[in-house]
């Protein structure tokens, strides 16, 4: 059972809700590839979250009729691979085949403004500029803050080689673009309702739009929740996440899978958060040990898919972990039917208690990483070693204190103090 947001995701650029000026620029860029390799081989889409940058990139690929090869620039493994043009070529085959008659793929560089935040680490941006210069395939680069990206070395080379479009659908409310954008959104929502066999009052649809503007995916999620459940989601002043997930967990344990799926698709709850809630409350709902073992096997499978999504970037698996975890009640033969007060995942309260310490560890890793020209992730793995040196080598301790401007929390990490 696919969510409405996924079911009605734009397949090509004509399906994307854009103002006329943005649509014209993107369409002209797509058309320029039909005449050979254009001067501007890459397209930069920038703007706040929820404005459809990534959706537009996939719609562009759909218009070309080719797949997307996605690299998330904020991911450390992909940042490192960006440094080597030869490695990119080996990974993506005909990326540099100038003789290609038409594009064979769209290269998506997502969240490029998060690329190489460490000072002086600009090799990847330089390599990206070379890739743009030589690519035989369209490249779409998304970023939230182009002005922050401009400050990085070689960023100007990337920007000058690209067509740059701000994904801002309107300047202010009630201007021409705002009215056009709103009309198009409302028409799309009404079309979805009609296609799914539901109706909602006009004022409810209007409130859903106003509540989520300009995030279309959230609008469709609220539309589905309101239509299917018969409740007016738009009347809620804010999404009370603990209350919503409590309701969703209760649905999962009542063995009505259709209701469970509706609660999942009608929410913005993160997959891992939902799975964690189910996992935490299994002992409260099971009587027999064997039932608990069977239920944990289901959660283990959902957890494995979460790992594949987060570590291997298999985002096509999104929603599967929730769908799997949501069916766990069918593996519990003897379930407690009396009232149970569901518990928030224990790791969340533990994370809250250790928040300051974790923040100190990360800031210390960043400082040491800058000093020794190493990534924060790798440095954080070696903090135990720097802690030993700090405690037993007076010269290094003095050096760290002079160079790192340590906070009390960072010093506590190095001295292993609580």
UniProtKB/Swiss-Prot annotation:
Binding annotation for ATP: 47-54
Gene Ontology terms, MF aspect: ATP binding; ATP hydrolysis activity; DNA clamp loader activity
Keywords noted in UniProt: ATP-binding, DNA replication, Nucleotide-binding
Disulphide linkage map: none
Pfam family, one: AAA
Keyword Repressor attributed: no
Listed GO biological process terms: DNA replication
Keyword Nucleotide-binding: yes
Subunit comment: Heteromultimer composed of small subunits (RfcS) and large subunits (RfcL).
Function: Part of the RFC clamp loader complex which loads the PCNA sliding clamp onto DNA.
HAMAP family per record: RfcL (MF_01508)
NCBIfam families assigned: PRK04195.1-5 (NF003229)
Family, similarity comment: Belongs to the activator 1 small subunits family. RfcL subfamily.
Protein name: Replication factor C large subunit
Organism expressing this protein natively: Thermoplasma acidophilum (strain ATCC 25905 / DSM 1728 / JCM 9062 / NBRC 15155 / AMRC-C165)
Gene that this sequence comes from: rfcL
């Amino acid at each position: 059972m696919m969510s409405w947001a996924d079911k009605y995701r734009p397949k090509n650029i004509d399906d994307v809700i854009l103002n006329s000026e943005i649509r014209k620029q993107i369409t002209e860029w797509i058309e320029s590839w039909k005449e050979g390799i254009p001067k501007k081989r890459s397209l930069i889409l920038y703007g706040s979250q929820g404005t459809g940058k990534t959706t537009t990139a996939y719609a562009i690929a759909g218009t070309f009729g080719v797949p997307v090869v996605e690299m998330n620039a904020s991911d450390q493994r992909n940042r490192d691979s960006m440094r080597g043009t030869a490695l990119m070529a080996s990974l993506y085959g005909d990326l540099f085949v100038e003789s290609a008659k038409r594009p064979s793929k769209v290269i998506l560089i997502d969240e490029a403004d998060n690329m190489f935040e460490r000072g002086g680490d600009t090799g990847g941006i330089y390599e990206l500029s070379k890739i743009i210069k030589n690519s035989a395939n369209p490249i779409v680069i998304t970023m939230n803050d182009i002005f922050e990206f401009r400050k990085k070395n070689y960023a100007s080379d990337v920007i000058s080689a690209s067509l740059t479009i701000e994904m801002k659908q309107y300047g202010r409310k009630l201007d021409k673009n705002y009215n056009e954008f709103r009309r198009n959104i409302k028409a799309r929502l009404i079309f979805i309702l009609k296609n799914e066999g539901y109706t909602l009052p006009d004022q409810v649809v209007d409130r859903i739009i106003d509540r989520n503007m300009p995030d279309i995916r959230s609008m469709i999620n609220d539309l589905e929740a309101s239509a299917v459940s018969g409740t007016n989601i738009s009347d809620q002043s804010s999404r009370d996440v603990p209350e919503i997930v409590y309701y969703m967990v209760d649905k999962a344990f009542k063995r009505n899978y259709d209701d469970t799926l509706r609660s999942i698709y009608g929410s913005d709850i993160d997959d891992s958060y939902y799975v964690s809630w189910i996992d935490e409350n299994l002992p409260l709902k099971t009587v027999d040990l064997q039932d608990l073992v069977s239920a944990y096997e289901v959660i283990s499978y959902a957890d494995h898919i979460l790992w594949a999504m987060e570590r291997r970037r298999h985002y096509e698996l999104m929603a599967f972990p929730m769908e799997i975890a949501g069916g766990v009640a069918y593996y519990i033969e003897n379930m407690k039917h009396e009232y149970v007060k569901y518990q928030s995942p224990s790791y969340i309260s533990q994370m809250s208690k250790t928040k300051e310490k974790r923040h100190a560890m990360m800031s210390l890793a960043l400082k040491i990483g800058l000093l020794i020209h190493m990534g924060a992730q790798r440095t954080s793995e070696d903090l135990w070693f720097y802690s030993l040196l700090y405690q037993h080598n007076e010269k290094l301790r003095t050096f760290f204190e002079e160079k790192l401007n340590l906070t009390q929390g960072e010093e506590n990490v190095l001295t292993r103090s609580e």
